[in-house]
Amino acid sequence: MLSNYNKDKGGKGQLMSKNKLLFLPFIVAIIVTLIFLAAQIPSAKVNPKHLPVALVNEDSGEMAALIIKNLKDNAPDAVEFIEYHSVKEMKKGMNDRKTYGGLVIPSTFSEQLAAIQTDNTPVYLDIYINEGVNTNVATSMETSLNQIVSTISSNASKQIIAQLQQVADQMGETVGAQLAKMNEQGGKKEEAADLTTMISPVQPTKVELLANPITATVTKVNEVGKLGSVPSALFVPLWIASIIGAVMLYLAGTKRPFENRIELTKFQLIQSLIPIIFGFFTGYLITWYSTWMLGYEFESFNTVALFASIAVIAFVYMILSFVVWLRLPVLAFFALFIFFGLPLIQLVPEMIPSFYGNYILPWLPIRFLVDGIKEILFFGEGVMNDYTVVLIWIAIGGFLLLWVRNLIKKVESKKE
């Protein structure tokens, strides 16, 4: 009996040990779903804080100063108002991505507001939207600033109506006094006719204007036009092509026997130069594909293609250097960049949760690709912008790491 029990127990143990892979799908499901859902946290928990909005007051009136003060004192947590001395200074801040929108009070604001009772022209406030930073933020920023202008207009309307009510009350008292005097002395018809013009200080045609005296004019800075989706569209194919290129170059030299150090060095030299050729080929090819298949029309095709080529060169060197040191399993780390990077590049830093903003975003090399394309397409920069310099340094670092590994690699002789 005991021997049979031990046999059964041993058989079950062998069965379990031989079928460990049966539990692998459950483990993979736990890990993969956790990673993919964690990558969506920035998009699911968008909580904008301190989005920079410019304020420019070109008017010297008390009303304009009061508007600026009230906006700064009552700013919500999602917005941070920053004062600029001029529209030119504000636009420079927008080009430097320091502000996403702006509200400008023109120099004629107080004058036009004071003359609105006699003039049929509405008073204007100028809204500026920095569309090139992020199209989603630009849309919400335009809506928010229009709501602010609507609130300012409503408050101004109440003040104007209150002033007109005081004038009407004074006129009523004057008319009452005149009528009483006419009743006592016997008024003339001509005098009674003149009193009809004093009954209401507001012409019927101005009622709608006085109800909404202030309107907004919207000016978009660094417009995206039909190219708003280009950074996201180019990011995935360029990154995947870089991973594939690096893997192919690595596999070309694995377990390949060499007769001597000279033969190995020749191969390593070719291997370290091919990323440059591959980068230009891939960068121009994908950029051309985007014009052919997606219908993008670039102002300068060569500028976009050249920047894309530099990005691919940098990424291939970086990935290849990691692979030669840490082997193929490190590719999983770079593959995750797609899932974690895509939600992050669609948001501005002020909308990203603090953990992702502090510990993940700074280590995403793909953000230099996305921001560099934005600089070229929306901000009027050339190929050599700040992000290009970073990509070049990434390429240099990857190249050096690759050659450090090459120099310490031992020669594997050919087997007879």
Task: Please identify what each model-predicted range represents.
Residues 3-228:
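Extracytoplasmic/periplasmic domains immediately adjacent to an N-terminal transmembrane anchor
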Residues 230-250:
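Long, hydrophobic alpha-helical segments
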